[in-house]
């Protein structure tokens, strides 16, 4: 199931882009607006992706209502177009059907691993177990270094995930407020150390950057996403397995006070949630 999901994530946007390009090439000489309907249906995934990549948004809404409306408007436009022509235009309906099917799968897909993780992963009130990582220089580090102060740990997939990258930038913007509450910000990467080091240099963020070699700590925390990397990225050096994007907040004693498993990448907590959790542990200096 995980590899099917990875295949879908890799191929669906590409297929939608190719369909839009072909529909545009057919509309240009044909001149009939039914092909605009085909493009509307298949642009339903391209527009949210563009929003994530260009605007750096960390969440796109629970139901992506506007994109869904565009998809169904596109289907209606295609129907009206074929009725006005008196020609069923089978290719147009194949493209519309593929677009609607892909969009519905995107909206309603459910990975059982994600819901199971809520029951077997770490929970508030538990001590954070000793976890081993590597820093950007390859030196061993562990969660023992976090004792004595609150910590916000973000386990993220890598720079190939636009939503994860937007979350990293969001934490960077909130860094003064988090550090004002005495919190250490730790970014734990599931991608190779060299890529993480380049990312840290590019962002120039004075945060704690750790790498999880072989995803051993992700396995220990039960936040591993086997086969979750989109198909094709392995050719560029990314591992086949990755993590479920997860936020842990611990107090100065190492007790877990907040956990967020992202079972749906379209729903992510606001950083103000982290601030409220920290406010219950450390008074904000005035």
Predicted features and spans:
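Membrane-anchoring/interfacial helices and their immediately flanking loops
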Residues: 1-52
């Amino acid at each position: 199931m995980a590899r099917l999901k990875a295949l879908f994530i890799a191929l669906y946007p590409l297929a939608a882009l190719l369909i839009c390009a072909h529909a545009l090439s057919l509309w240009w000489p044909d001149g009939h607006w039914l092909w605009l309907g085909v493009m509307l249906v298949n642009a339903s995934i391209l527009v949210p992706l563009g929003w994530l990549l260009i605007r750096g948004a960390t969440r796109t809404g629970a139901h992506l209502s506007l994109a869904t409306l565009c998809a169904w408007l596109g289907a209606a436009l295609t129907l009206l177009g074929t009725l006005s022509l008196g020609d069923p235009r089978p290719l147009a309906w194949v493209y519309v059907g593929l677009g609607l099917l892909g969009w519905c799968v995107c909206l309603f897909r459910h990975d059982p691993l994600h819901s199971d993780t809520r029951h077997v992963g770490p929970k508030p009130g538990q001590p954070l177990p000793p976890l081993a990582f590597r820093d950007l220089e390859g030196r061993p580090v562990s969660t023992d270094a976090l004792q004595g102060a609150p910590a916000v740990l973000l386990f993220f997939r890598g720079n190939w995930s636009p939503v994860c990258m937007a979350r990293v930038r969001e934490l960077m913007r909130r860094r003064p407020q988090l550090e004002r509450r005495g919190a250490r910000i730790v970014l734990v990467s599931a991608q190779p150390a060299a890529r993480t080091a380049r990312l840290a240099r590019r962002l120039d963020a004075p945060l704690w950057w750790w790498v999880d070699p072989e995803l051993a700590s992700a396995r220990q925390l039960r936040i591993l996403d086997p086969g979750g990397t989109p198909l094709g990225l392995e050719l560029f050096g990314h591992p086949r397995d990755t993590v479920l994007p997860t936020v842990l907040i611990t107090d100065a004693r190492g007790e877990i006070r907040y956990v967020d498993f992202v079972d749906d990448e379209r729903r992510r907590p606001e950083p103000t949630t982290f601030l409220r959790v920290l406010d219950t542990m450390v008074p904000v200096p005035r």
